[in-house]
Amino acid sequence: MKLNIRAQTAQNQHNNSPIVLVHGLFGSLDNLGVLARDLVNDHNIIQVDMRNHGLSPRDPVMNYPAMAQDLVDTLDALQIDKATFIGHSMGGKAVMALTALAPDRIDKLVAIDIAPVDYHVRRHDEIFAAINAVSESDAQTRQQAAAIMRQHLNEEGVIQFLLKSFVDVRLL
């Protein structure tokens, strides 16, 4: 699947490969914006919303091979043969999965805050419960969604991070 992207053109044109920035779980393409701002001087930057995140398509399949294929599909749609990938957390595992699927598409790879191992800890169950509760409710505003999330989560910072992806239907 082709992912939603934000593309930025390098201010100083070099022959460097473009850099694809891949966010972590519950994130969006904005999450690595600080890196994008620093790197765009010398590199074309592509920030992606991974599947089921941000404005990218939704799909019941959510695994690393599928996410790696999405990156290939996105490169194909943009007519990019090879890129440098920087992935954070879930994005890091997705770009590591890309090494098995399409190693020829990778110029360089940076995985941040993740290792290529299985994580058996179910540390996001409360977050999924909060997101599901909002999805199943008739919440139409960020305030309503936040109130529902507070029934499942105690960390206000996590709630505010999750609300970045909430669409206030009054603004549509």
Place the predicted regions along the sequence by residue.
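Alpha/beta-hydrolase fold catalytic core
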Residues: 1-20, 40-43, 80-82, 171
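Active-site loop/oxyanion-hole signature of alpha/beta-hydrolase fold enzymes
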Residues: 6-8, 33-40, 46-90, 94
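Active-site glycine-rich loops that stabilize anionic/oxyanionic intermediates
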Residues: 24-27, 89
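Alpha/beta-hydrolase active-site loop signature
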Residues: 26, 50-54, 116
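Flexible "cap/lid" loop of the alpha/beta hydrolase fold
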Residues: 96-101, 107-145
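Conserved alpha/beta-hydrolase catalytic His-Asp/Glu region
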Residues: 122, 137-172
